[in-house]
Amino acid sequence: GGNKEITDALSLYNRNGNIGFNDYGDEIDGPWDGPRTPSTTSFYVNDKYESDDLVINAGIRVDQFNLDDWKMKNTANPGWDETGQTILPDEFSDSDKKTVIQPRLGMAFPVSDRTVFHLQYGKYAQMPELDLPYASSRYMHLVWGGQNYTPDPMGFDLDPIETTQYEIGLSYQFSAAAAFDFTAFAKNTIGQIVISKNEDTDPACVSNGTCTQYYGADEDALYYENGDFSTINGFEFAFRTRRINRLQTYASYTWTDARGVNSDANSGAGNLTQEALAAPPAMIMPLYYENKHRGSIAMDYRFGDGDGGLLLSNLGVNLQYKFNSGHPFTLSDGGMGQRSSDSGALLDDARAREPQEPIGQSTTPWNHFINLKVDKKLSIGDYGVTVFAYVENLLNTKNVINVYSRSGNAYNDGFLTDPALSSEIVAAQGDLYVDLYENVNLANRQHYTLDFGQDLYSTPRTYKFGASINF
């Protein structure tokens, strides 16, 4: 009976997070590792009121979210059997359905014959990302067993993430052919997911009466919960013209200030491993996804129907220039931790990462893109066909979108140039190791893409061709 014993042993060793499939890609069913069916039920009603020059749009949306997840009966004592490496069913129940009411209000009225004032208020809600609550029972063993540092745990019965947004602005038409719009905005988001450690998970609950039996979850195990927030403030300026002599132009600029405690759910993982900082400090800081400056300029040159002869009729050319400032990052240092020599000393493990400056003080370089689109409308019988060619990043600009946190640039990860990190490895493995490291990791970023799931540079020049049919 060796085959089943081997496959069972391999499954326990893998301890992955498959939901709905086993290790071999076969579909499975069951209460714990079977497929989940999250759902959203929505209702929306809107009414528009007009009186003289005043326009009011008011509405309300109601969402009911069902994550199809599990809920712990006692979060201070998770029902986990470490000996059998399985869930104790009586200690869990179905997660609650969450209902969120979201009012919306928009208003516009003129203050002169060329100026219109507008404002908007709205509440919005969405489910958390589904990879945060969903985990197989074997992955729970990895998290709750306490044998490993696992910075990607799971959450139970998570609440929706709610956003309140405010906008106020005005539109001004300063000529018959041109107008601009200015809008200031504020966005407050609460209930974002954050990594945490349940300080109440302790055998002491047996003696103080908060639980009748202490189960097998490690008292230092991490989990996800709702508890983070962010605030985004800014303004947007847009300029547009009517089409004059076949040419229409549009330009926009947005300034944004994004601040919060954590840039993503795992930002505080390093603090939770340090007993002196058991609770992450609630410091407000720039968020890593902030682009302080963002803008675009577009020119669209287009022939009308019957204009320019058969070849040029309904032909259009659109040229767009886009730019944005970089995003915040933190220059850091630290040892290799548990990394192997082929992947260098990337600072992906928060336990080995030591900030060398205030969080989010540095910024990646600015990005610049030029895109070109050419399209032509054709009439084929009763059908309208539009064929197009689109070139993204026309000049093939190599924009830096991420950097190594040790060096602050995208071409040197700071490993080979730091003798304290690499001298012993280079001495043992020789020049061939250096050559392979420079070509595989630095030139082709293999270690970075494998660790972080993204690249250091933007997408190179891309060609797209297509057609759409209207009937």
Which ranges hold each PLM region?
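Transmembrane beta-barrel strands of outer-membrane/channel proteins
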Residues: 1-4, 58-64, 119-123, 132, ...
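Membrane-embedded beta-barrel scaffold of Gram-negative outer-membrane proteins
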Residues: 116-118, 122, 128, 132, ...
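Residues that define the transmembrane beta-barrel architecture of outer-membrane proteins
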Residues: 37-41, 97-101, 162-166, 231-233, ...
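C-terminal beta-signal and adjacent terminal beta-strands/loops
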Residues: 308-350, 364-369, 376-471
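Residues on the lipid-exposed face of transmembrane beta-strands in outer-membrane beta-barrel proteins
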Residues: 43-49, 105-109, 168-172, 237-241, ...
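Signature of Gram-negative outer-membrane beta-barrel scaffolds
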Residues: 1-114, 128, 132-135, 146-148, ...
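Gram-negative outer-membrane beta-barrel transporters
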Residues: 185-188, 205-328
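Outer-membrane beta-barrel channels and translocator barrels
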Residues: 51-54, 110-114, 163, 175-177, ...
